[in-house]
Amino acid sequence: MTVQQYLSYIVNDIHRTIVATVDDKGLPVTCAIDMMDADENSLYFLTAKGKSFYDRLIKREFLAFTAMKGEDTMTSVAVSVRGKVRELGFDKIPELFEKSPYMKEIYPTEESRRALTVFQIYEGSGEWFDLSKKPIERASFAFGKAEESPEGYEITDACIECSSCLDVCPQNCIESDSIPYAIEQEHCLHCGNCHTVCPVGAVTKR
């Protein structure tokens, strides 16, 4: 999937997200926010200027969120994003209301909508995690000027082919037909079992 496809999936297939920001004491605060639009490099949402959520966005200019879709754990897809935000103001409100017409029931009059403002997540990174696939499927992406930050584990040239890692990998995602062994990153849970059991320290964090 392309970055735009990930962002569009958040808006069109999930929509409701749980957003985390930080308060004045440095403590996390969460709230439910609908992601209402996306383009090739950003996401858009709105909030009211009177909310404490608005104050936190203005002060920190950063957020993180997770969006989930599925009937239960084993049918779920989760997309997590963290990134920089900026306020765009009122101009995009009519467009977002047309794309999410239920908002007209919450803010029914033009006057009531004057409290609203649009924010853009213009730079960030994200992760796709699909538990409905066997083996699981994961991918990372970045947008704006952000770069992907590799996570998980890799096997170095110190590998001695002892197969200890193969025995403890819950997704059987370690390839053993080459030296050193290789982790299939798109299926890895990042559980760290391979790192823990390797007798020669050949498994390192990326």
Regions found by a protein language model. Name each.
Residues Y9-P28, L63-A67:
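A short, Trp-centered hydrophobic/proline-enriched beta-strand micro-motif
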Residues E40-Y44:
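Short active-site oxyanion
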Residues L116-V118, E123, E127-V168, N172:
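Ferredoxin-type iron-sulfur electron-transfer modules and their immediate structural context
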Residues I33-D37:
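A short, well-structured catalytic beta-strand-centered motif of the EAL phosphodiesterase domain
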